[in-house]
């Protein structure tokens, strides 16, 4: 099993814009990010999705973090489907870890995608971002942006923006203007794939999502079905996260929609060649070791 902990995205700390000068002049919507699926669920049990902590994911080169939230007695907890199944703690702690990392890395820009299936009040999320010290550095667009209207990374950093926040459901931008509706900006491929060939790049969400106008999220996480229970497949992770496997599905998306996805979500991101793929997909100099 190939496990790597040093990223070309992370080692060039002197370079602006997520470790690469070449990214400074690119629009946010013209970059492909390797992202961590269920980034808060760290461990080796069947319902975990990552081996390394959120800070380690960021050190590794990940700049797109996806995470589930659930309602536990009115509080926002980082729970996997149900809090009795897996509870990684309060949202505040998760955000505080990200905030601490950002404070030590002045030229880095991070995207956070949260779920809110339990329709927790958006004001509670606002409180968590404020208490974690992120509220003053989030992106607040003055209007809904088309794909071509996104600023460059340099423009975002120059404005003091370090974080973009999206939410899948139950956000309210009239109350909290920086938690953006994911599906105003992205479409997603299906998740829960059990075929290691990843044979599809069809639109799963939103129902009428248009890849010709939205940014794309490619779910590249392999699962296995155990007596009707779908769980992350750890055994084939090195193959799933190989540059070949990632590139193959990216090519399928590009041939289907004329554009490569903006985000590739992975489980067990430090296994395989995820960062090599990120370097390659963005046409950047350097290699991952």
Q: Model-derived features: where do they sit?
A:
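Fungal secretory targeting signals
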Residues: 1-16
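Catalytic cores of phosphodiester-bond hydrolases, prominently lipid phosphodiesterases
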Residues: 16-289
């Amino acid at each position: 099993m190939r496990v790597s902990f040093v990223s070309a995205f992370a080692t060039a700390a002197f370079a602006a814009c997520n470790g690469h000068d070449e990214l400074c002049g690119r629009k946010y919507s013209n970059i492909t990010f390797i992202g961590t699926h269920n980034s808060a669920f760290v461990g080796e049990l069947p319902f975990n999705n990552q081996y390394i902590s959120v800070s380690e994911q960021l050190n590794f080169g990940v700049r797109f973090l996806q995470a589930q939230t659930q309602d536990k007695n009115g509080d926002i907890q980082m729970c996997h489907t149900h809090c009795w199944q897996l509870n990684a703690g309060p949202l505040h702690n998760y955000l505080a870890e990200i905030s601490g990392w950002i404070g030590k890395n002045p030229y880095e820009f991070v995207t956070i995608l949260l779920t809110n299936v339990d329709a927790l009040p958006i004001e509670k999320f606002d409180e968590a971002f404020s208490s974690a010290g992120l509220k003053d550095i989030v992106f607040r667009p003055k209007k809904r942006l088309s794909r071509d209207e996104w600023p460059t990374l340099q423009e975002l950093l120059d404005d003091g923006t370090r974080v973009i926040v999206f939410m899948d459901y139950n956000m309210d931008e009239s109350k909290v203007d920086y938690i953006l509706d994911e599906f105003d900006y992205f479409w997603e491929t299906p998740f829960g794939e059990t075929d290691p060939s990843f044979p599809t790049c069809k639109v799963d969400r939103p129902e009428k999502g248009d890849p010709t106008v939205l940014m794309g999220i490619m779910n590249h996480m392999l699962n296995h079905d155990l007596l009707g229970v779908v769980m992350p497949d750890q055994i084939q992770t090195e193959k799933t996260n190989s540059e070949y496997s990632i590139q193959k599905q990216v090519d399928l998306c590009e041939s289907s929609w004329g554009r490569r996805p903006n985000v590739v979500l992975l489980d067990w991101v430090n296994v395989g060649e995820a960062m090599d793929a990120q370097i390659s997909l963005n046409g950047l100099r350097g290699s991952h070791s």
